[in-house]
Amino acid sequence: RMSDPFWAYLERLPGKSAALFDWDKALSGWDRYPLFRDHFLQLTKNHATAVDCPTECGLGCPRSVVTHVKTNIRAICNEKEYPAVQLTTRQTLIYRLKQSAINGAICAALGIEHREAKLDGLPHTWRLGDFIPTAGMDFPVVLTMQDSKDALAEVVRSLCLSIPKPFVLIAPTRLHLSPAVETLLAQRSSPFIALNEELHLGDAPWFLTRRDKAAIFAPLIGQVPEPDSGG
């Protein structure tokens, strides 16, 4: 099964919010999109002043949203290369990721004890809770959604300084995982989980794992002492 496309979109989306027109453009080809939209996106009070350009001209510049009257809203090509695109009012509404719902669904799928907290000073980064392979052993689980290698490296360096034991780092994809960050995590015996590789959205609004949880968390389960080993 192909990986769900929304993970990669979330990773590159500034502020984890966009006009409905943009969510639709990015994800409407995905069969689970209506389910994802209804359960994991939240309407805000804001309207877009620009939307992503629907043409493949290669420039990649946004289109300005111009409202003449309420029934005449258009996305204008500022380069005047293409005709304007007619928009509905609903398409200009800004929807943001319902982060608490996504975080809870990730924890439920991966068997993480959900005790959520925002991490101060680290943008788009949450302590989701703990992975507890056996009583008395717990590993902090952190979700981060960064849009560059430098940003991810900054987050990981900070986590390595503030968390005194192995932890689990979760990100939407491994796109921004540099060799330097992999080394940092390996030195801390801290596994990295790419959500697009491990989870997919099922028929109901929750995630399913692509493989057994014991395989996903094998590096940590390997740190659990054997019974009667004195560890």
Predicted regions located by residue number:
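Helix-turn-helix DNA-binding segment
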Residues: 229-231
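Generic recognition of flexible, low-complexity loop/linker segments
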Residues: 129, 156-157
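Short acidic, S/G/P-rich loop/turn micro-motifs used as interaction or catalytic elements
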Residues: 113, 132-152, 161, 173-179
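Charged, structured surface patches that assemble and position nucleic-acid processing machinery
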Residues: 159-225
